Amino acid sequence: MATITIYLKYSGGDLQYSTDNVTYHDMTETSIVGANPGDTVMWTCADDSIDKINNINVGKTKTAGGNWKDIWSSKPAATDNTKRTYSGVVSTDPESPTNPALNGYDINYKIKNGGNVDKDPTIQVPQP
């Protein structure tokens, strides 16, 4: 099982992400490229522009049969008390959605020299 890391930073008045910690994009819509069932997905603060991630709430997505289903066997949770890294595991349930449907999630984080901020991007379901 692999680990996919999404690096987060606050720049230009918006939340930005990178999968290589080099090239950053505004977080609007993205795919967790290469995620397979059982893979761990980690969100981590790339620099001190974000003091901490307060929480990451993930939604459910629809299966081909039209039922709502979690794509996470372990929902994103803080890995330690600093709350600078969150980790979740992609479901291995064979009934989990495997088509590129959309799964909404919300990131609430605290910026340096500022308050709490919410970002509600749309993320594509990890592809098996």
Task: Show the residue positions of the predicted features.
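Intrinsically disordered, low-complexity segments
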Residues: 16, 71-72, 85
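Hydrophobic beta-strand residues in large extracellular and virion-surface proteins
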Residues: 4-8, 15-17, 41, 56, ...
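Short, surface-exposed alpha-helix to beta-strand junction/turn motifs within ectodomains of secreted
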Residues: 50, 54-72
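Extracellular/periplasmic metallocenter environments
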Residues: 7, 75-128
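N-terminal edge beta-strand
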Residues: 2-37
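Residues that cap or initiate secondary-structure elements
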Residues: 12-14, 49, 94
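Beta-strand cores of secreted/periplasmic/IMS beta-sandwich domains, seen most often
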Residues: 31-49
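Predominantly extracellular/luminal cell-surface or secreted proteins
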Residues: 18, 46, 59-61, 110-112
